[in-house]
């Protein structure tokens, strides 16, 4: 079973950090980057996703006042070590559109709940043609933009790199979760 837990110093993430490092997930391979990098934000929270009591993922949300006062950046530091879960792929584009993946079922709702559904929420992606965010920037944002879940807001220099900023339509997203219940047992 999945469970998402707010990060705290008592969590043993040694193996999670080690695996993230071995996979080149440099934003998730130690506490300094995953958690401490947000210490100067007005509000911040990191969560760890567990499957059968093993840490298998992470996500963060924080105030995004540098972009817009009172706004939040969500789905930061998103990572899933899917080889430790029964759900290893988003499957088809149609399944992805119906939110049959870990980010939609666990990470995004957790971030929305923490921020408040009426808050101004944004995700950021790296538009560079290389790097770990390439598929997120090209594929996922394309699907979510076509379905009205996100809207391109700007391209900005942020945290040392060019990033695309996307406004999240949290009301639409949460209503679609009700419309499309999880049909994969591995997402329940």
PLM-predicted stretches and their roles:
Residues 1-33:
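Short amphipathic alpha-helix that is part of the acyltransferase structural core
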Residues 26-82:
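A conserved beta-strand-loop-helix scaffold within acyl/acetyltransferase catalytic domains
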Residues 43-44, 116-120:
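Short, high-confidence coil segments that cap the C-terminus of an alpha-helix
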Residues 86-113:
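Conserved acetyl-CoA-binding loop-helix of GNAT-fold acetyltransferases
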Residues 113, 121-141:
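Conserved beta-strand-loop-alpha-helix junction that forms the acyl-donor binding cleft
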